[in-house]
Amino acid sequence: MRRTPGPLLCELHAHTRWSDGELTVAELVDLHGRSGFDVLCVTDHVVRSDDAWRYEEGARFSSIDETSFPLYLGEVEREADRAWRTYGMLVVPGLELTFNDEEPVLAAHAVAIGLREFVSVDGGIAEAMRTAAEAGAALVAAHPNGNEPATRRGRLTKRFSRDAGLRELAHRFELFNRAQLFGWVAEAGLPAVASGDFHHAHHLRGWKTLLPARHDEEAIVDYLRSPRPVYITRLEDELVRAAA
């Protein structure tokens, strides 16, 4: 079903209207399928029940909870079937385990790829990561800030760069999130990926991961859980148009 040989072009971190993305699951699938992606991971937010950002004035903040998770997973799996038939694109479900805190050194997000059961973050990010890993997910430390400035309010998530114990729970680390580089990840020699953290259509461009793995979910999750090397590429408008 693949249109081109070689490593798989992946978006490992993407959001829909189930949390804070602008597109439905179907729209997300069509955009990435038409643009030549081989793998799309749908990873909407789950936040703790007392998350402070829920109550920001004017904030649009939705997230997955234990009640909505079966509906979310069902929609992603239906769209995964259509994506494979229509585009030869693999769609993998997951969640972004989201532990926000006003103190950046306590805040951390982890993308759980291949997760098919609900995981709460009410017990803390470390417990959530352990639970997701035990369920078979690949865990990617998302936008792991070192000393970089925040690109927008509420985005500083520094705990991975400060907490060696938490780092040990992640299989991979975002070296690039969109166009933002987290240099400490490379300096520490950590297994890296690049993702778009897709919320809006213009996030289709930017740094992405090319994965030298078999084109099925089990192989992709297994590869991401390992320290094996990946390729990183920057996707520009011309390449997106050429792939479509």
Q: Could you tell me what each predicted segment is?
A:
Residues 45-46, 144, 198:
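Short, ordered loop/turn segments at secondary-structure junctions
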